[in-house]
């Protein structure tokens, strides 16, 4: 996560090499890598504050105030803890299962087809129908807390124990890269510089 590139109304506290973020009331945390092609996978452990957590993707420069009440010209897309999804263009709508502390949310971002799917504990949500489609341009990792503090840990393939919070599972992507808790979906790769050089 990019400790400099943050926005919103709430404070954000980073730790574990900027891979753990405590995102306070309407704070926005964003990743440091953006992609516009390829198929990419990463995981997020919900550590605490599950009732105010969101996991998603965003374009560079996206920011949001009260749960996607945004005047930003950039776009963001989230999977909310109550199982709904939301983008700035519309209200929240039904998508998948709710999630809680200790759950792992997987993000499968397919920029070749312009869509994103979310996984809860290795189960693809909404029977595999994409949460959002028609994505284009650069997109990257995004988190927001709302109405409280949500603490999350990001794993882009470097530590499937999530800083010792889980028992490591040592799954790799199709290139043999990464250390994931769950195996990435077929054809999706760890968001790292080696894969970016080949597939980005």
What residue ranges belong to the model's regions?
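PRY/SPRY (B30.2) beta-sandwich protein-interaction domains
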Residues: 1-200
């Amino acid at each position: 996560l990019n400790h400099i590139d943050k926005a919103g109304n709430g404070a954000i506290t980073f730790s574990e090499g900027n891979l753990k973020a405590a995102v306070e009331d309407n704070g926005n945390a964003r990743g440091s890598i953006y992609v516009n092609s390829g198929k990419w996978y990463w995981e997020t452990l919900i550590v605490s504050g599950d009732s105010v957590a969101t996991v998603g993707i965003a374009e560079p420069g996206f920011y949001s105030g009260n749960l996607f009440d945004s005047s930003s010209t950039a776009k963001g897309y989230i999977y909310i803890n109550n199982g709904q999804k939301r983008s700035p263009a519309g209200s929240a709508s039904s998508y998948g299962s709710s999630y809680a502390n200790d759950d792992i949310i997987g993000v499968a971002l397919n920029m070749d087809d312009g869509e994103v799917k979310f996984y809860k504990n290795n189960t693809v949500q909404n029977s595999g129908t994409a949460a959002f489609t028609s994505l284009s341009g650069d997109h990257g990792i995004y988190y927001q807390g709302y109405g409280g503090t949500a603490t999350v840990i990001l794993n882009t393939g470097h530590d499937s124990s999530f800083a010792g919070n889980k028992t490591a599972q040592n799954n790799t992507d199709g290139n043999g890269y990464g250390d994931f808790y769950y195996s990435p979906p077929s054809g999706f790769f760890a968001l790292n510089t080696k894969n970016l050089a080949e597939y980005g």
